[in-house]
Amino acid sequence: TPGDTLNINSGGAAVTSNIGPSSDEGSFDVAGSRTVSYDHIETLGVSGPGAGSLTVSGTNGDDDITVVGTGVDDFTVSVNDSPAIQYTNFTSLTINAMSGDDDIDVDVNMLAIATFDVNGDLPTTSGGDLLSVSGTNANFSPSATDAGSILVDAQTIAIASTEQVFFDGETGNGTLTVTTPAGATTTSLTPGATIDSGDIQVASLLGLTFGNLGATGSVVLDDADAVADDTLVYIGSG
């Protein structure tokens, strides 16, 4: 059976979602209102008419956070074994994964909100936090060892305090573009086990692993400035 349902209308105010100790427990903080706590609720939905901002906080353990686009400004978010909470008419989403080696999975679909920030925070091990994004076309722009941005289809995601990024092209035969920063930069490309997978490392900045581009998918390296001063190193398997 579908169980109990809780629906909240934020009235456009900022919303913070906090996971509880059990999968069906947690709370919502709506700016200007009292905290709404829930327990043993199986279906949850929050609407923020056209101007809502949402912050989702993980735990200090190793979390699995999943975001699935269900519309241009609609999406679901689940944390670990929690229900996938439906958020409708939100224009801003911030994921604060907190401490631990967290996995943040984003299936963009038609999502195109104005602001989407992923903050991995402090890792537990050297492997650290992993952001995986699925779509057809992407443009990845690293800016620091743990930061950058990735545009997947119509959605830009700002990345901070994150150690690994993976792009899944869903065999859509799209184009993956990696934009290198201005100035002379060395980029390494290591092919993967399949023709549509591999690893790209721009200098010592945040690296990118990609897969499932499709048999006719392509990879483009694009220098941010007009001066032809970059170097590409192709690392073969032989």
Indicate where each model-derived feature is located.
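Acidic, glycine-rich low-complexity segments
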Residues: T1-G238
